[in-house]
From Swiss-Prot:
It comes from Mycobacterium paratuberculosis. Residues 1-17 form the signal peptide. One of its GO terms (cellular component) is plasma membrane. This is Lipoprotein LpqB. The keyword Cell membrane applies. It holds the Pfam family Germane. Residues 24-46, 560-585 are annotated as: Disordered. Belongs to the LpqB lipoprotein family. NCBIfam families: PRK13616.1. The keyword rRNA-binding does not apply. Its main location: membrane.
Length: 585
């Protein structure tokens, strides 16, 4: 019964358009860690009505500790013995119970909407759909009141209680090049702040979510382990990461000896803890000695600033734009046509600066919208000449990887990497395996943008946001894997997208009530204010501080301000119809 039900539920999530979250054998998986129960969880009482008891049971499943001990208080002993609570939890809302009552027994069926899933690693993903009938739930009257005597296997978690109990934290793993760290958001139910650091470091050791297993490096992988719980820098057990107390992390069985790898060990730990508001200094020891003698008294975030996941790429390059088909830069409130090929060429329809801001990739489209439309990709140094690197009937807006390679979609379905051959210096086009994307989400890819760390690709397919992992195969080729949909609330309205941070994407839409929205890696979407934006909006580019969109009146910018005055404003010099913003990325 249990395995059949689990298969049915995962099928429901897949049909709804959200990949099921694989379970994990992580040693610190949710539900196995011994910790106090959150204080806001309900408990059964003798006079509790059967329906009330069922609803309170769904709330109690929010605490995974000790194999959902809080929820098991609502079960008879035989039901508790039989209940399999392993694997992913389904997050449900708008729950309705249909009951058949007798004096000593109640049988109920449950109807609900599925809003997402939560894996035993703490990975949350949004979903949508109706919960298939999980089978009957039976209650019996005992000396202590009503108790559940039969229930389906698996965990059904009340959405409101999930939001009240779990907190989103982000783990960080090293990108394949070792230049930066990559976010892996997790949800944890740790009511005691002093236990949070231990929980997060334990999750780092357990490893990334399955879709990231082949896209990142984990310098904290086993056999490395924690020697004991994370403490204050002076060894104290309370006030960890608060005030000037700092945090002390004692590791053992660390095999890496080279300084750069040890720096990445520190970076993974420090950014994970710092982003969880667990403050340094961070005293990190390995096998009884400092991880690095230079930092025996503790590391700070400035010591790993080179890997800062929040740094804006090529910030010094500033905003550029395509105006009347040519690339321009901003000089105060005036535009200046850039020297070289990209300033001379007309009919440019999409462009991007490289991550360091020193190179340009641009698409020239002739006879746009006509049957004989032709597009070509040009790459070169900013201010210099360019080389034609790809062509087709249509080309998507280009995007740069962390290793300065340009990605583009040719004719809607063929994803290419445009490189320069080391020996000849000539351009070469290398195909990217996108079969997994095309199989799951058929249709032309109208926009593709790589994340800053280049381990993820966000795409627009059929007006939907599709996220995929970027994997490098053993043969050195690249593939887009684990595709899943983000932002069900966006419908099919998405036009263009851009990574604001490694965890947050900005999109333009055809919805005049919400012309610009955000969606994160979990799939949760929210809206930017609409006032000041005229329709239609097209190209969007963003960095951590500002989003820029192309509209009928030219380029608009949006920067949330500290005083709460949030709105869109025109970019001086770019109030030209058809102007499109360009940033590194």
């Amino acid at each position: 019964m249990g395995r059949k039900l689990l298969g049915l539920l995962m099928l429901a999530v897949l049909l709804a358009g959200c990949a099921g979250v694989p379970s994990s054998s992580a040693p610190q998986a949710i539900g196995t860690v011994e910790r106090p129960a959150p204080s806001n969880l309900p408990k059964p009482t003798p006079g509790m009505d059967p329906e009330v008891l069922l609803r309170e049971f769904l709330k109690a499943t929010a605490d995974p500790a000790n194999r959902h001990l809080a929820a098991r208080q609502f079960l008879t002993q035989s039901a508790s013995n039989a209940w399999d609570d392993a694997g992913s939890a389904l997050l449900i809302d708008h729950v309705v119970f249909v009951e058949t009552r007798a004096a000593e027994r109640v049988s109920a069926t449950m109807r609900a909407d599925i809003l997402g899933s939560l894996s035993d690693m703490g990975v949350f993903e949004t979903a949508e759909g109706v919960l298939p009938d999980p089978g009957p739930i039976e209650l019996v009257k005992t000396s202590g009141g009503w108790r559940i005597d039969r229930l389906p296997n698996g965990v059904f978690l009340d959405w409101q209680q999930f939001q009240a109990t779990y907190k989103r934290n982000t783990l960080y793993f090293a990108d394949p090049t070792g230049k930066t760290v990559v976010p892996d958001p997790r949800y944890v139910a740790v009511p005691d702040h002093d236990q949070l650091a231990t929980e997060l470091v334990s999750k780092l050791i357990a490893g990334p979510r399955p879709e990231m297993a082949h896209t990142v490096r984990n310098l904290l992988a086993p056999p490395l382990r924690l020697r004991g719980p994370v403490t204050r820098a002076d060894g104290g057990k309370s006030g960890i990461g608060r005030g000037y107390g700092g945090a002390r992390i004692d590791l053992e069985k660390l095999s890496t000896t080279d300084p750069h790898s040890r720096q990445l060990v520190a970076a993974q730990i420090i950014w994970t803890l710092a982003r969880a508001d667990i403050r340094g200094p961070y005293v990190i020891n390995a096998d009884g000695a400092p991880l690095d003698d230079r930092f025996r008294d503790g590391w700070t975030t400035s010591d790993v600033a080179a890997t800062d996941p929040g740094v804006a790429d090529g910030a010094g390059a500033g905003l550029h734009a395509l105006v009347n088909g040519s690339l321009v830069s901003l000089d105060g409130q005036h535009t200046v046509v850039v020297p070289g090929a990209f300033g001379r060429m007309g009919d440019q329809t999409g462009a991007a600066l490289s991550r360091n801001g020193r190179q340009v990739a641009s698409v020239v489209t002739l006879h746009r919208g006509a049957p004989d439309m032709a597009a070509s990709l040009w790459i070169g140094d900013l201010g210099a000449e360019a080389v034609q690197s790809a062509d087709g009937h249509s080309l998507s807006r280009p995007t740069w990887s962390l290793d300065d390679v340009v990605w583009v979609v040719v004719d809607g379905n063929n994803v290419l990497r445009a490189i320069q051959e080391p020996a000849s210096g000539q351009p070469a086009r290398l195909p990217v395996d996108s079969v997994a994307v095309a199989t799951r989400f058929p249709g032309p890819i109208t926009d593709l943008q790589l994340s800053r760390d280049s381990t993820r690709a966000a795409m627009v397919i059929g007006g939907q946001v599709i996220l995929a992992s970027v994997e490098q195969t053993q043969a050195g080729q690249y593939a887009l894997t684990y595709p899943r949909r983000l932002g069900f609330g966006l419908g099919n309205s998405v036009v263009s997208l851009s990574w604001r941070t490694g965890d947050d994407i900005v999109v333009t839409r055809t919805d005049s009530s919400h012309p610009v929205s955000y969606v994160n890696l979990d799939g949760v979407n929210s809206d930017a204010p609409p006032h000041g934006v005229q329709m239609p909006v097209t190209t969007v580019v963003a960095n951590p501080s500002t989003a820029y969109v192309a509209g009928p009146q030219g380029v608009l910018q949006y920067s949330p301000s500290a005083d709460g005055q949030q709105g869109w404003s025109e970019v001086p010099g770019l109030t030209v119809p058809g102007a499109a913003p360009v940033l590194p990325g």
